[in-house]
A protein has these predicted regions:
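Extended, intrinsically disordered cytoplasmic tails
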Residues: 22-103, 107, 111-127
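Intrinsically disordered or low-complexity boundary/linker segments at protein termini
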Residues: 3-44, 132-315
Length: 315
């Protein structure tokens, strides 16, 4: 009974901690607040590298909080302190290597997605960065886990018409991304890890006017990486604002030497082979993930970005 009582107290204290923070905070001038939410400890350090390259050279000072949420039923309350120490070890090591000061935050939750959105919305964050989990990952362990989950679904659940989002990685990622974007009052990035180290060769996909915000993020990224960028203009001549989009793209590549507008109009495995990072807007991702599934098996590490039209956060 003692572990049970401890667990109840832990959940209560955690809920109270979240409530304490839930006083709406206005974003501070000159500060770009990023909430980086990670699951596995090793992923935290990789996502920190992404955040540092994406935001550290922005016009506003980067203020990053690393959040690790554990589902309540998975935690032994008597080992919480040790669990927290192990979870943040790699990301704190990464921060030290980068010369970054970061905040760490550990919570036990029974509704991780909602708690993450509550923290973002009530504490004045400008950006939410989350990982895709094993979805679309190309690590051997994650591929094996995905195959097992898919075969398990096909064998036991398909005949009962259970939702594919329970088991299929593409559907899981789509649902996860949609939830964070729908509930967060800030820009959101969902990171897909494909052995990410540094964004030295970045592919940027533009298919509509609403994707042009990616150019601002690209400009900041290049200040940190000093890499190169290739831009794919996926729109057609019938795309609304086609001429204006092209003008802005040409202005962009004309002003930044290490960028180029590619002749490619489609995303292919051959194109992906030349890049180690991709920036793509949320709506464009939804279209590409539906119609170019095979090609995406060869995609590089990718950050799916959504610009929140309700906020004016700007780094």
């Amino acid at each position: 009974t003692i572990p049970l009582v401890s667990f109840i107290k832990l959940c209560f204290k955690t809920r109270e901690k979240i409530k304490e923070h839930q006083v709406c905070v206005e974003p501070a001038d000159g500060i770009f607040k990023v909430l980086l939410s990670f699951g596995r400890a090793g992923n935290g350090q990789i996502m920190l590298d992404v955040a540092h390259q994406m935001f550290a050279r922005g016009k506003n000072k980067l203020d990053l909080t690393a959040l690790h949420l554990t589902v309540g039923s998975d935690v032994n309350p008597l080992h919480t302190d040790n669990f927290e120490e192990v979870s943040f070890g790699p990301i704190l090591y990464g921060a030290k290597k980068l010369g970054m000061h970061i905040h760490t935050r550990y919570e036990v939750s029974n509704n991780a997605g909602q708690d993450i959105c509550d923290i973002v919305n009530n504490e004045g964050f400008d950006f939410l960065l989350v990982g895709s989990g094993i979805s679309m990952s190309d690590s051997p362990d994650d591929i094996a886990a995905t195959r097992y989950r898919t075969s398990f679904y096909n064998r036991y659940f398909k005949r009962f018409k259970a939702p594919e989002s329970w088991f299929y990685p593409g559907a899981l990622l789509k649902d996860k991304t949609k939830m964070f974007i729908a509930r967060s009052n800030c820009d959101v990035g969902v990171f897909i890890n494909r052995n990410f180290v540094k964004a030295t060769n970045t592919l940027v996909v533009i298919s509509s006017e609403e994707d042009l915000f990616l150019l601002d993020y690209t400009r900041t990224l290049l200040k940190a990486t000093h890499g190169s960028v290739g831009i794919v203009a996926k729109m057609s001549t019938t795309t609304p604002g086609h001429d204006q989009i092209l003008k802005e793209l040409w202005d962009f590549v004309s002003s930044i030497p290490q960028t180029q507008l590619l002749p490619d109009k489609d995303l292919t495995p051959g194109l992906f082979n030349s890049y180690n990072f991709m920036l793509i807007g949320y709506n464009t991702w939804n279209d590409v993930s539906e119609h170019r599934k095979e090609a995406l098996q060869k995609m590089p590490s990718t950050l799916i970005l959504n610009k929140n039209r309700r906020s004016s956060s700007d780094n």
